[in-house]
Amino acid sequence: MENYRGLWLEWGNGNCFFWSQEEWKPVKLWVAPLVKKGISELELWEEPVFCERWTNGTLEYFYGLKEFLTFEVWGVPIYIFDNHNHALYFWYKEYFQNCFAKGVKLIHIDQHSDMKPNDEKIDEKNLNSVFWFVQEQCNVGNFIIPALGSGLLGSVDQLRSEYWLLHYDKPDGDYILDIDMDFWEKMMGIEDKEWTFEQTRKLISWAKMVTIATSPFFLDQKEAIKLIQELFDEMEDKSEA
């Protein structure tokens, strides 16, 4: 489907910015294809999608999804993927399809802000140029700033705790809902998971689109899939592709 057809990243940019200790050789990470399937089709895969270089110089690889999924819930486009920077591409995909206008608000449910500095400018001429920007010039921690710089996003509301999610009021205008499932990682200490799910479901129902990252480095992927299934379990038409 479009640019996401499955490919290897083999250079030192984007999420491939770690190098082996003994050789100047870039790591090799897999980017899954995007398919139209429902929640029940979420599967893990055996190829590495992220790596971390530890202080002793060793590389640890992390594994993600077999396929990225897209489907609709109540007419709202949903995208599920592993590394969070892919969200930027899907925002542009829906923007180019006139789902929303530039200057849209982003509601960001996550452990992290994902707003580390990124001085690179997006070439917005088409989705292909956006795709390669996402792969080569972004990583999981710095993909939001370029969207603010281009004007695609007008503002960002950061919901990084249970308290802020549960006390958040729906904005008046259009918004994108961006979710990192590591928000429900055990160390976050969520006390009422179902209540946070219910608030998230409401935000999904009103959104122009929803992007969901499983974040292999920050969350066990079996747990991520389980949480996504629980989140959508109470939503009608949850697997409409």
Question: What does each of the following model-derived ranges do?
Answer:
Residues 2-241:
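Conserved alpha-helical scaffold segments that buttress catalytic/binding sites
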